[in-house]
Amino acid sequence: MAHSHDVSVCGTYILDILGVPVTEIPPGGGRLLIEEIRLAVAGTAGGTVVPCARLGLRALAVGAVGSDEKADWMLNALEREGIDIALMERMTGAPTSATILPIRPDGSRPVMHARGASARWRIAPETQVAACRSKILHLGGVGSLLAMDGAPSVALLQDAKAAGCTTTLDLIQARRETLALVEPLLPYVDFFMPSIDETSAMVGTDDPAACARFFIDKGAGACAISLGADGSFVMTRDGRQFTVPAFDVAVRDTSGCGDSYTGGFIAGLARDWDLLDCAKLATATAAIVATGLGSGANLVSFEETVKAMNTLPVRKPARA
């Protein structure tokens, strides 16, 4: 079957404005000098589509930006990455979703987010048909896609499966109540790719195997759970399971690492790799991004990422 693209990445597209290192917020009108300020295409879709493109995939961006200068920058940045933006909607009268991230010296950061076009976006019928022509369809941002959450997301994934797509799913900052949005989607999801913090918030345990089994029992074909500094855990419906340790790198900022992991995993799936190799590529992708500032930082190419996958030292896991 001929596919229009390797992957359609649907969901939240956010402009991140990052500064590092931020040791304090100066009182009043005080000034703090920092080393670097960076703009990045982010969000659970934006932070995934850029790694997909840099890892050699024909990527299609599917989402929305506003009618402001942030939208101009975002669309130009996506085009510079070689990403097809034909299905990116530009909403009149809406701001582009954006986040300010003051990164502390230890890599942690508070999040100051302004909801915008991504929260208002609902995929149009003709856009949905076009998005389902790719080999893989990824939906990212469940819980923050206020106009898409629920029945519209179910319909998108149903149509993707009916069209023969491999489907992947991610969410953002899940809470217990997010589970009600996720459950109806799982029968149409081949790979559910949350973080352990998100799964534990929904399921009530931080045991990766128990979390993965829970979501597989609800219908997911497989679950790949990112474990932060401990790597990731993968379980499939047929009983296969394994842990891939993280790589030992000098971490500067973890913004977008989970989305980069997803992008790396998708890049392996698009090449029909074994799942263990997909997870290793995903882990290397996230490790490289963690060494820089913001989503997609320091990620150069598929070849360089494979080299890192095969040569970076492995981090000793903290999780027992």
Where do the PLM segments sit?
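Conserved phosphate-binding/catalytic region of the ribokinase-like
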Residues: 1-8, 33, 159, 208-320
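Conserved phosphate/ATP/ADP-binding segment of small-molecule kinases
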Residues: 158-166, 172-241
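Conserved phosphate-binding/catalytic loop of the ribokinase/pfkB sugar-kinase fold
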Residues: 90-91, 101-146, 150
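A short, aliphatic-rich alpha-helical micro-motif
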Residues: 2, 130-132, 186
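A glycine-rich helix N-cap at a beta->alpha junction
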Residues: 77-94
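Hydrophobic beta-strand scaffold residues
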Residues: 59, 85, 167-168
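Glycine-rich phosphate/adenosyl-contacting loop at the front of the ribokinase-like
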Residues: 1-64, 69-80, 250-252, 316-320
